[in-house]
């Protein structure tokens, strides 16, 4: 487990992303297989599960799996994203994600690939104050917009950043990781392999 905030809260260092793998539609047999995968993940100490409205049916399948595994799952650290260029749709996506997952509170809500981040950050801050979100994050991948992401880390009240980091793509080591360390922002590596 790794400490990630001033609260002393800890998370396993390996999480589960749901892009492609949980976008299985309404096929019950496949949904049940994903439920088994999620159950095994929790049983073996996993916690962070990351999704997005961009991932097709993934959030709906997660809600299905969580219903069958029993609620609450004590080790679940729920993470999803808002992903729309239209500020008015952001609030709808947030409400829809709560319904699909069957959660009243998300542990982490992120702005996907910095899309309309200025507006969505305000919306997420309001939700954090209301208690429907515990932590706020921003994401990017494939080395895009690193300069902008660094500025956000340095100037905005965020708790997490999610970015591409692996043996072949180590660009973030130069500026983004040091900025996150300096500001106390937790880092989630996507595409680690």
Could you describe each region identified by the protein language model?
Residues 5-11, 63-75, 94-104, 124-130, ...:
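Acidic (Asp/Glu)-rich catalytic clusters
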Residues 1-76:
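N-terminal binding-site loop/beta-alpha segment at the start of enzyme catalytic domains
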Residues 4, 16, 41, 49, ...:
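Conserved, mostly hydrophobic/aromatic
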Residues 26-42, 86-102, 119, 143-153:
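Short, acidic/polar
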